[in-house]
Amino acid sequence: LLAIGGYRGVITFVSLFFNIAVFSISIILMSWGWDPVIVTFASCLIIAYITLFFQNGRNSKTFASFFAVLAVLLLLFALSYFMGYGAHLRGVNEIMKYEEEIARLSPDISINMAKIAVSMIITGLIGAAMDASIAVSSAVYEVYNNNRNLSLADLFMSGIHIGGDILGATVNTLYFACLGESLTLFILFRNYHYSVLEVINSKAFCQEFVDIVISCISCILVIPLTAFAISYILKNLNRFEKYLPDDDLFIELDELREGKH
């Protein structure tokens, strides 16, 4: 990381440790009986804050991405609840994966497994949502930096077009990640001659399918939200100057002001 990324690589490494610490604390809180959904929401916000602001600084790109990710989290928590409870997800696949390790342990961990399933879905999508969001905001920022006469609508459409290119790769990444994780499950279905209906009605398959669907929805939603947020910020820079001390545009403005004096 130091050789390739330099100072930014070191910051990335440090922020990774902070994120691991946040995740570890969230597991401890859940084991103490705290609501898994609330803990997951809070931990995802902290992870997003660390990843975006600590790693990349407080600028218009990270500011827009953070609020787009926040909006997506709020929307998808409701959707995850609906789909998770509607599909009767209970975290079965995660438990079955480690059946050998927990064979001698009691399965009664006094935690609502339906909420754990929702937490798993949200935790799985936060990374992909941040990736897509920061990619769109960075691209729109560069478009504006090279042509500051563009209107808010022009910048927004630039973000949508860029997001469309990003979306295909992101969705494929999510799909193949889930497919690779569930490869043994699909081999099991094949060897035991499961019918299509039996596969669809399998709780293990259903959980993986819901994970993919909600993660893809998060990436679809975050692109227009980020495109609008970054476009609005860039066309209303004076309103946000005090919140974005690390933005190159404001540093440039400060240098121009000092030059005039």
Predicted regions and their residues:
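Transmembrane alpha-helical segments that form the functional core of multipass membrane systems
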Residues: G9-E94
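Membrane-interfacial helix-loop-helix connectors in multipass membrane proteins
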Residues: M30, A87-I111, I187-F209
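Pore-lining and gate-forming transmembrane alpha-helices of multi-pass membrane transport proteins
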Residues: A68-V69, P107, I111, K115, ...
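Helix-loop junctions and hydrophobic alpha-helical segments within the transmembrane domains
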Residues: L152-G164
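Hydrophobic alpha-helical transmembrane segments of membrane transport and translocation systems
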Residues: A3, Y7, R190-H261
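Hydrophobic transmembrane alpha-helical segments of multi-pass transport and channel proteins
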Residues: L74, A78, A128-A132, I166-V171, ...
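Short helical (or helix-break) motifs at transmembrane helix termini and adjacent helical loops
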Residues: G127-V143
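Alpha-helical transmembrane segments of helical membrane proteins, especially in multi-pass transport
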Residues: T123, G127-A128, H161-R190
